[in-house]
Amino acid sequence: MSERSDLLHFKFENYGDSMLQKMNKLREENKFCDVTVLIDDIEVQGHKIVFAAGSPFLRDQFLLNDSREVKISILQSSEVGRQLLLSCYSGVLEFPEMELVNYLTAASFLQMSHIVERCTQALWKFIKPKQPMDSKEGCEPQSASPQSKEQQGDARGSPKQDSPCIHPSEDSMDMEDSDIQIVKVESIGDVSEVRSKKDQNQFISSEPTALHSSEPQHSLINSTVENRVSEIEQNHLHNYALSYTGSDNIIMASKDVFGPNIRGVDKGLQWHHQCPKCTRVFRHLENYANHLKMHKLFMCLLCGKTFTQKGNLHRHMRVHAGIKPFQCKICGKTFSQKCSLQDHLNLHSGDKPHKCNYCDMVFAHKPVLRKHLKQLHGKNSFDNANERNVQDLTVDFDSFACTTVTDSKGCQPQPDATQVLDAGKLAQAVLNLRNDSTCVN
């Protein structure tokens, strides 16, 4: 017997960094460069494999366009895009603080998630957690006297009493020349907490979530969200009217703002955001977004739509940002999703790959097929796919019929027993499949 030889295992420390340095040197010497990325008026030469690994957006562009030049256009300066591409080689990105939002937006366009994550973390340091008693300095105390409480009960949630207090943060005061302006919005719930502590017993007995969480919410925030989150909070709080109902001191949400679909919880307390996975309800958008992370849901902070996958949220954010990275080479029309581009190409090629399995009509666009199924047949795409599977499994039972050719003696041969049994089982299976496919829950 041969003795078992021992395996030698070598692990080279910092091997990846050294390889990137060598590839960057080759790029600087313009050796083995197989692509040129044109960012408006700036050319960036490099290697497809490096750019594709660092930017999923460029990876898709390389797959769609097998040429040595790729043109992209970003809203920010061309130098911002150039620095982002060079960081794929060096792993280092350095820029002034006032350019943070520009780099965050450009990195989101290029789908460089590692840079988006770090920029989001850096952006959070400008948002300072509010102090518990800051509202006393800038806002009039509403609970100073019993008379103010009586006026509050008569006012029924007047805008003057319920309007939020806005204080510029210290960082924004120091950065007057910067493009970044951070404001800290104190919610109406905090002001009402200063007015009366008795109302706290009527709130839901759940663990409170901080309004300004120190944990980065990069999984829920895309490039355009950070720029508008303060504006959304302010508009949301201005429209959120609270009122007291007599001596019971029950806080009610204004139905004129949120409509009749608001659900009440705990003695008339009504909220705005309800978790689709559990019974928790939230008044503040930030708390609701933090809670959704527990269910592995990702929410758009602009429209409130939730997604089960982070990539779907990123594709959804392109619609809000107006980003359309997929362009038709024939007519130049751009699209926000690759599937929309592929559907559009059917117009140029004349292909109609989408077929209705109920009437054999074909369509170039899938949305047209869905509309056809709903209006004419009362079906959906899932039913249409099941109908196709049933048709594929439909068997010509005549092929299982025994041949009746007469032999030389004038006798007809009898069919094989196993052949008849198999045909019977197959016929029953097809009938069962048809019954299952037409079952409606």
Curated annotation (Swiss-Prot):
Function summary: May be involved in transcriptional regulation.
GO biological process, one term: regulation of cytokine production
Zinc finger (C2H2-type): 273-295, 298-320, 326-348, 354-377
Annotated localization: Nucleus
Residue spans of biased composition, Polar residues class: 201-216
Cross-link Glycyl lysine isopeptide (Lys-Gly) (interchain with G-Cter in SUMO2) residue location(s): K184, K255, K329
Region span, Disordered: 134-177, 194-216
Superkingdom of origin organism: Eukaryota
Any Pfam family matching the protein: zf-C2H2
Gene Ontology annotations for the cellular component aspect, listed alphabetically: nucleoplasm
Tissues where the protein occurs: Ubiquitous.
Record's protein name: Zinc finger and BTB domain-containing protein 26
Organism taxonomic ancestry: Eukaryota, Metazoa, Chordata, Craniata, Vertebrata
GO molecular function per UniProt: DNA-binding transcription repressor activity, RNA polymerase II-specific; identical protein binding; RNA polymerase II cis-regulatory region sequence-specific DNA binding; sequence-specific double-stranded DNA binding; zinc ion binding
Chain ranges of the BTB domain: 33-97
Keyword set, alphabetical order: DNA-binding, Isopeptide bond, Metal-binding, Nucleus, Repeat, Transcription, Transcription regulation, Ubl conjugation, Zinc, Zinc-finger
